[in-house]
Structure formats: structure tokens, C-alpha cells
Amino acid sequence: MILPGDPKRCAKIAQYFDDPVLIADNREYVTYTGTLDGVKVSVTSTGIGRPSASIAMEELYRCGADTFVRIGTCGGMQPEVKSGDVVIATGAVRMEGT
């Protein structure tokens, strides 16, 4: 599962799938499924913030998803990380108040 926050990003990501199919579109949750090099893959938006991402991931897990890759934008605190850099986070500072 590829998980952007913004539902508009799902269609942009799905255009790289082989034969993408729109599965669902309900408020902040949009899902496309297709294949990449013969491997089934889906993209589902989670909405913004930890609570909505948690709800989405728990529901997707109950539907059988077992691998999640969260993608999107974020702020950073290290001056050496420039705009456009790809960052694979191993931790986070939770300041969202939830």
C-alpha cells in the first residue's frame, strides 16, 4: 500500500500502474489498485495527520494489506536536508497534539 495524505495524489500515482482501477472514492479516502511489473499494488489516501492515517492503516490491515509506505511532504529540522531531497525517516517528533 502506497499512502499519500492528499486524495489528489492517488490518481497521479496510479497513472504509473499497469491497468489502474478506481476502487473507492469517499471524502479523504481514494483507492486505486493495479500492478507494477506484475505485482499487485494499491494507493490509498489517508487524509492529513496521525489520527486519520491511523484509521486508514488499521482498516487496510483488516482488509488484508500487510505492507505500507507512507509518502508525502513534511517539515524538517536539519539544515543539510534540502527541498526535494528524499528522506527515509527512522523516527519523528510528534507535535500534532494528539
Regions found by a protein language model. Name each.
Residues 1-98:
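Metabolite-binding pocket within alpha/beta catalytic cores that recognizes anionic/polar moieties
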